[in-house]
Amino acid sequence: MKRSSTWMMVSALTLVMGCGGAPEDVPPDAPEAQEDVLFSQTILRERPDGTMSQETTFITREEQLAQIEARDALVRSLGARVTQQDLDDLLIDSGCAGSSLWLFDQTSRTGNQLCLYKQAGADAAWLNLGTVIRKFTNPYFVTWANAVRSLYSGVHPGALQSCTATSCSTLIYQSFNAYQLLNTISYGTQLNWAYLYTP
């Protein structure tokens, strides 16, 4: 019995000395690991049969700013001659097309991003933002309903509206023109439907 006790004591002491020592010093010139914050970018498309497809990718703020700058540059270069054909090919990192409506969940076009566009043949299109997942906050999935805080519209004008199952409010809405930039949405906490139309 003494023999096994001694052996256990030696083993424990060896483990403490081998594993319990002071941590190794990190060289002072070693760069600190700094992760870029990723934002989700959700692209929603209406298929010809009327069903919706949803694709979500993740981008950094730097990539998001590059997309915004690319769209700004194209709109500046085309002036009043902007057409949907010009903008459909504007894609950066398989992101949102330049002709899409870009919705953001933070002010000043930051945060998670949802991209919507209307089928070319349709005069108007509606979407319940409560049907689109924005993020997962344990233990819940959070949707885009009541979450839009800024937007950058695309080729189609439209509105964000506050709707129930039977009607939409005539007092609480945010309309926008084609290629309009809104860095703050005043009724953002109550807007749960998106609407695009062909003028």
Predicted regions and their residues:
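C-terminal motif of bacterial Sec signal peptides marking the signal peptidase cleavage site
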Residues: V16-G18
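Bacterial N-terminal signal peptides that target proteins for export
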Residues: M1-M9
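Compact beta-sheet-dominated domain cores in extracellular/mature segments
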Residues: D25-P199
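Bacterial signal peptide processing site
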Residues: G20-P23
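Flanking scaffold residues of small Cys/His-coordinated metal-binding clusters
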Residues: S11-T14
